[in-house]
Amino acid sequence: EEPDLVRLAEVLSLAAQVEQPLLRRARLAAVPAAGPELEGRFWFSPLAESAGVDHLLVDPRAADVLRDRLRERPADLAAAREVIRAAHEHADPAVVLFEQVVALSLEPDADAERVAEHLLRLATTMAEDRARAPDVARWVLRHVPRLPRAVPPRP
């Protein structure tokens, strides 16, 4: 296990997709002493799935484990959420809503109702523009499997 690579992956596990600017921002925030070669190691690691020219997706099984690890460290989780939020501030609304669902599911007081409300907003946002139907279908196929496994039960 490479601690720097895992730390970087934990941050990126909260993202709907990882573009180069987000990868760089996450590295600088999570592992500032590491050089840019860490970004390349992540891009071509088994943690990355569907790596393309301009972005990649984090493997969904790995993302669940990485998110669980991050949940155990609230300060690191908050910092990671801020990295993702800042990087995707002007991203497609579906990306932002997906990331909000992920973030909500990791809150200590997460409940299924709040997550369901965000999922409904996500579906509504994606369905509003019928011209984007093929893009929406592709997005759903790629991102629905990446939603968090489950919302933690309430104590």
Which residue ranges define each predicted feature?
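Leucine-rich, amphipathic alpha-helical/linker segments
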Residues: E72-D129
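Structural recognition of alpha-solenoid helical scaffolds
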Residues: D4, A62, A79, R114-H118, ...
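Alpha-helix capping and helix-coil boundary motifs
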Residues: E1, A34-P36, D109-V115
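Leucine-rich, hydrophobic repeat-scaffold detector
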Residues: L120-P155
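C-terminal boundary/linker of central alpha/beta nucleotide-binding cores
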Residues: E2, V6-A15, Q20-R73
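Amphipathic alpha-helical elements of HEAT/ARM-like alpha-solenoid repeat scaffolds that form extended
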Residues: D59, V95-L104, P134-W139
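Generic preference for hydrophobic/aromatic residues in regular secondary structure cores
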Residues: L47-A48, I84-R85, R138-V144
